[in-house]
């Protein structure tokens, strides 16, 4: 005789607990090809994230300031559901979406407490790629 399967474990849906976070950190990774925005709490636990490519921009349109603005607004709205009011911004990379992402977060009504550039600078480490000849 077949054993009755335990469907109660499969039917149990884990409800996501919304924690209330007043202050957070925005990590903006702006490369030449894409912009990745991650909003975390002070401990580094991710609350929200968005990318230019995830907002529907493909190809060369991903690397525009407007795509970074749309991604920042999307991540900012999700973070506001967690009760985020103040944000510290950490920008990494040389991409075109650096400034527009910060402006978009400020436009949502979130207070920007600090802006810092955390772009890694090598102390003459790896050899860089060869220069482009157009």
From Swiss-Prot:
Cellular-component GO terms for this entry: ribonucleoprotein complex; ribosome
Q: Which UniProt keywords apply?
A: Ribonucleoprotein, Ribosomal protein, RNA-binding, rRNA-binding
A GO molecular function held by the record: rRNA binding
Gene3D superfamilies per UniProt: Ribosomal protein S11
What is an example of a Pfam family matching this protein?
Answer: Ribosomal_S11
In Gene Ontology terms, what is a biological process of this protein? translation
Q: Which residues form a coiled coil?
A: none
Domain of life, per UniProt, equals Bacteria
Give a yes or no for keyword Transcription regulation in this entry. no
> In the UniProt record, does the keyword RNA-binding occur?
yes
SUPFAM superfamilies (alphabetical) = Translational machinery components
The record's note on quaternary structure and interaction partners says: Part of the 30S ribosomal subunit. Interacts with proteins S7 and S18. Binds to IF-3.
Describe the function of this protein.
Located on the platform of the 30S subunit, it bridges several disparate RNA helices of the 16S rRNA. Forms part of the Shine-Dalgarno cleft in the 70S ribosome.
Family classification: Belongs to the universal ribosomal protein uS11 family.
Please identify the protein, giving its name as recorded.
Answer: Small ribosomal subunit protein uS11
Source organism lineage?
Bacteria, Pseudomonadati, Pseudomonadota, Betaproteobacteria, Burkholderiales
Task: Tell me the name of the encoding gene.
Answer: rpsK
